Structure formats: C-alpha cells, structure tokens
A protein has these predicted regions:
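Glycine-rich, proline-tolerant flexible connector loops at the mouths of alpha/beta enzymes
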Residues: 36-60, 115-122
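Active-site acidic/histidine proton-transfer and metal-coordination neighborhood
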Residues: 19-25, 60-68, 76-177, 184
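Conserved beta-strand positions
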Residues: 10-12, 35-37, 113, 147, ...
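A short alpha/beta connector and helix-capping loop motif
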Residues: 186-193
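Boundary/entry segment of secreted carbohydrate-active catalytic domains
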Residues: 2-19
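A short, Lys/Arg-enriched amphipathic alpha-helix followed by its capping loop at the start of a domain
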Residues: 3-8, 26-32
C-alpha cells in the first residue's frame, strides 16, 4: 500500500522573497540538498528566457535539487477558496497539465496538493475520486502526489487528509506533513502511528 517517505526539503515559503540564486544559497546554507518551488516562480523565470533545463542545471551547480513543486490547487473539481485574496488564487491557478510539465522538466519527484476549497464543499468520496485521478496523472510523469492538510481549507486536519490518502490506495499517494499545520489543526499525534 503506502511506502514511508521521510524527507526534509527547504520549503519555498521560507525563501519566497529571495532571487533564485539566493534561494539556492539559503537552501544550501541551511543544510538542505532539496527545495520546493511554486509553479509561478518557474513560469516567471521562463518568461525571462530561461528554460527548465537552465533552471535545473543552475540548481544542480549549487548542489540543490528542486524535488517538489508546491502547490497544485486546481486538482479538485472545486478548488477556489472563500478566504484567500484574489491575487493568491490567480498565482496558484496553474493547471495540472502545466504543473506536471514543469515537474517533468525539473525532475521533481513530489507534488504538494492543497485542498484550497472551503471545508464541507466536497464530500469525502468526491475528494478521494479527484485525488485518485491526480495520482494517476502524476504517475504518468513519475511524480508522487503528497496531499497536504491545511487548517484553513477543505482538509483541515491530518486525520481527514490521511483518510483520503488511505482510501485512494495509490502507489504514489502520500501525505505532506507540515508541523505548523499539525499544531494549528490540533490534529491527534496518534494518527501518525
């Protein structure tokens, strides 16, 4: 069923305001060899003439692999939040096609899925069905699909996210665990056992 994956990656939000070369430097100085980036960051670099191969090579030259793309918010049939600014919604409106194009070009092995939709707007079965479809699409690109629980959205707790991953039973279906989200959600630590 599920395989345990324990990895630590520099999260894009820790270096979000730095230029790309400084993101790489901060990642390395913090002792990480992997980092996540937002699709919008990559698209911005592409608009300046850089290719995915250029970006990947520049990271590798600094001893860093971009192993995670974060977030894919458009994976579910309902995805627009009722509590986020329009600017964030637009910045994270990357389609699954575009998201996985970037993942493949950079060699990303993980994708973070956020359930940005309002709590209660989708049933467990609908969420699980959409998650399965996304896992299948991710598998075509060699990407693990890590469902992240975020307290202010549609999957606010570890338990809810785990139930989706467990019920989907996909070989590349995993959880993305964020300690801040765990504490804020008041999730039960026993769920991790």
């Amino acid at each position: 069923m599920m395989k345990p994956v324990n990895s630590f990656t520099m999260n894009y939000s820790n270096v979000v305001n730095l230029p790309f070369v400084e993101k790489l430097r901060a990642t390395r100085l913090a002792g990480y060899s992997t980092m996540s980036l937002m699709p919008a960051d990559i698209q911005g670099m592409e608009q300046t003439g850089r290719t995915l191969a250029d970006i990947r090579s520049e990271a590798a030259d600094q001893g860093v692999q971009i192993n995670r793309m974060d977030p894919l918010n458009t994976w579910s049939r309902r995805w627009v939040s009722d509590n986020m600014p329009d600017a964030y919604t637009l910045k994270t409106a990357t389609t699954a096609y575009e998201f996985f194009r970037i993942c493949e070009g950079l060699g990303c092995t993980h994708a973070s899925l956020n359930a940005m939709f309002p709590l209660g707007s989708m049933s467990h079965d609908e969420i699980t069905e959409d998650y399965i479809a996304t896992c299948k699409l991710g598998a075509e690109h060699g990407v693990n699909i890590d469902l992240e629980f975020v307290p202010l959205w549609g999957l606010p707790s570890l338990e809810m996210a785990w139930n989706v991953v467990r019920d989907a039973d996909q070989h590349n279906g995993l959880l993305c665990y964020d300690i801040w989200h765990h504490v804020r959600s008041k999730s039960d630590i026993e769920t991790l056992r």
